[in-house]
């Protein structure tokens, strides 16, 4: 059976028994078609949704309904009040399936103020104080659930005893919404298709009918249609109505087969059109990667002896990175610059990788990129490439199009990757520096800077205590309970809460709403403590960042202060396992590495919102002309104009809330958030992007702050650009 979730559209009648007609009139054209469908839209569900929608948010309600099976076989049996409950079991001994002692029942009946202790004999009953989703979690088992409240969600509510035992407990009106004790759900006859209004997408072969129409305002979950559609889109559970009609009504219909509905087409046993196998644009989400086995070698010692080289495997390096930089197998390359640091191409390979291991083992290692060891590596040879494969970089680790924050410790070469990779595309700005937020930018913006204030407070402590704290942190067997380390942490945390958290909170729009933002931070606590609503990726790199810190002697407070700062930030971080930062770097920069091998020029698109001229004029702005002003919220590039023209006709469920200041500083929010998986895979996205007017020359005079909401649509840019690679 294929289950199809239908969110009622406008003019839907709950009393209309012809449910199929409300989906599409062609489904009722022949009796034999109707026989292939079963409908699951119980009346008790409507009552429960109406009741809970007044006390819960739509998101909470939707989350609770996800675990409910179709059909619901369980019942919620409402127990009478303690005295009437005991009286019922005394009157009908066969109902005492819990074997409650008769003495307990008689004592409860005789008591003027009976307690609820008599219910303790009923295992797993749901008390009135239980969470609202307790019932929904138990419904899947299919067994009856005993409850003591009329407010239940997820199963029909029935009386556990005859109605006379509820006198004085339930009013006549309340009894109308409760089934009698002898009621049982109607037998549900499975058919080829089951249409349901229960928005649960977790069952096998369950899909969401993607009807492009306004929702029924009386249905409590209609406001969640965009969110539910995004959920189905991410899970590839969308079912186009034309596909269903082709399966049951007219085989001659030609639905468009797309990745968004691939699982639904397979469940319907529809054959893929022959034209669907033809390439339609370059897929920028499929990134080729490879593991490279490298030999790292040291210089000869004073006696001319050469130590054996060390073979390391750098995992999941973009193939196009090596191709663009003309890195060849079997060639011996210098590993270090005159400064002692690794050469840029090796740093890029390490930063964009998933891990570095000793070849032939699973032992991960961290490389020292600065001159730290007595005999550092000075040469590298790429011996061979192995395990060539393709990874999907569209939907993770960053999930949304607006902003993501990567947390890395100090000394993690964040500026290296931001400065070096864009240099490969000097003909086009693949990122906008204004939308790259450095981890030290906030502290440096304070007067005096955060590091300077921290140094001033440490200077009030005993110098020997600071030396002991640094030694304890750098010691292989570091003792973090040392009183010196604890003292430094207390000073840091107090100062951070005092000056950094309020400052972080004040720049919320800059982090999350100025377009497509890549922010860096030292720890996720920096964002969480300021309640910044941004996705945070806890990153790690295969480089020993502490050794890199020790090589930076020109920073505030010298290396000692940098080591203390790094340790304090790391103690703030949550204990969640980190994700290789290379996965995010591959997601953001990897698609651009494939550009040099394109044979077609890239055509630029814009994701635009419209600002009505009259709204701006009402806020004091002087605008040239009456047409709406377009706001460019995001851009993208494609290789096939005809393919793009078909894709951009798709309606976007997200809407834009745009705020424009009198200084023309613009911020945009998406409601619901715009997931990356909803953007076609043939769209090449910039690493970062800043919201701006498409035609700023139409703004003759700025006015006051103004906000407006708008739909979103993709449009072709008037000045398409050709992207070429110049190399590093």
Curated annotation (Swiss-Prot):
Functional note: Minor inner capsid component. Displays NTPase and RNA 5'-triphosphatase (RTPase) activities. May function as a cofactor of polymerase. Associates with microtubules and plays a role in the formation, structural organization and morphology of viral inclusions, where the assembly of cores and the replication of viral RNA occur.
Cell compartments where the protein resides: Virion; Host cytoplasm, Host cytoskeleton
Origin species: Aquareovirus C (isolate Golden shiner/USA/GSRV/1977)
One Pfam family per UniProt: Reovirus_Mu2
Family: Belongs to the reoviridae microtubule-associated protein family.
Molecular function terms, GO-annotated: structural molecule activity
Primary location: virion
Stored InterPro entries: Reovirus_Mu2
Protein name: Microtubule-associated protein VP5
Gene Ontology CC annotation, any one: host cell cytoplasm
Entry keywords, A to Z: Capsid protein, Host cytoplasm, Host cytoskeleton, Outer capsid protein, Virion
